[in-house]
């Protein structure tokens, strides 16, 4: 897809890609550009949708969604991200190339909230807020073909990753309370 720096954040990512490419062209330094998409896992900040929803559900608090929740995302478990990035470095399979690090299995934000509430057996309610301003991405889905070539196993299924994360947060909460 064409690069469109719609925000300072996305513009810096495009700039970093261009700098890496220039090192290859100028100094013949081999590079592999990895582009992570919605990685989640233990110790992730609650500023991100996955951990934010799980923390809310575990505490039976409302889960807020912008708009109708039809915007889609894909989620990549941290272990898959690490394995793909490490193998990209050691295998030299995609030198001077770009590898999207993420799942290509889409889920709507509403479905994600419902799934998390179900897995957590939560009493949380879903609250809809006005949609974000125009320009917010309604769909993010990477082509994960190259990433799949770097993994020795299938991507972690979303339900498996969420269940692992829920167990992690529960254990961590118990440890914190025991101190």
Regions found by a protein language model. Give the residues of each.
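Catalytic helix-loop patch of NAD(P)-dependent Rossmann-fold dehydrogenases
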Residues: 1-33, 45-46
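Residue-level signal for the nucleotide or nucleotide-sugar donor/cofactor binding architecture
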Residues: 7, 11, 44, 48, ...
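Glycine/proline-rich active-site loop of Rossmann-fold NAD(P)-dependent oxidoreductases
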Residues: 14, 39-52, 59-61, 66, ...
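Hydrophobic "lid"/C-terminal helical patch
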Residues: 57, 85-89, 113-116, 144, ...
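C-terminal "lid/loop" region of Rossmann-like NAD(P)-dependent oxidoreductases
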Residues: 68, 96-99, 107-114, 121-139, ...
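Non-catalytic, hydrophobic alpha-helical segments
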Residues: 81, 85, 101, 112, ...
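Amphipathic terminal alpha-helices
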Residues: 158-179
